[in-house]
Amino acid sequence: MDIKVHVRESDEDAYVVELGGEIDVYTSPKVKDAITELIDQGHYNLVINLEKVRYIDSTGLGVLIGGLKRVREHGGTVNLVCTNPQIKKIFDITGLVKIFGIFDDEQGAKKALAS
């Protein structure tokens, strides 16, 4: 069980958090730390790219929801990039498609932040 986390600044006044691997009870703290660090630095518009994520459990979903809640307190938002049908299904079943912007590509997710 591993997770790769890469954070980069985007040209749309947003930060992109690229994740790869599995987001579960063991790897979620690393994801939470990356998101928390951005928020603590005053970055409230985030794109979390899940294209390379193979698996996410309830702990991982909780980290994403927690991040969204924190950025919304500052007028920001979190958009997700998700192309894996199994991961998309989890967001659909849990109803999280109603609270997250979920996009098929990073460009669309970043563009939606700007509007």
Where do the model's predicted regions map?
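Extracellular glycan-recognition surfaces and repeat-rich motifs
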Residues: 1
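Acidic phosphotransfer microenvironment of two-component signaling modules
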Residues: 85, 107-108
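STAS-typified acidic loop motif
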Residues: 4-33
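Amphipathic alpha-helical interaction surfaces in cytosolic regulatory modules
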Residues: 23-100
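Short acidic-hydrophobic, aromatic-tinged amphipathic segments that line or gate anion-handling sites
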Residues: 101-105
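A short, charged, amphipathic alpha-helix used as a generic interaction element across diverse proteins
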Residues: 109, 113-115
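Conserved catalytic submotifs in the C-terminal HATPase_c
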Residues: 11-12, 51, 107
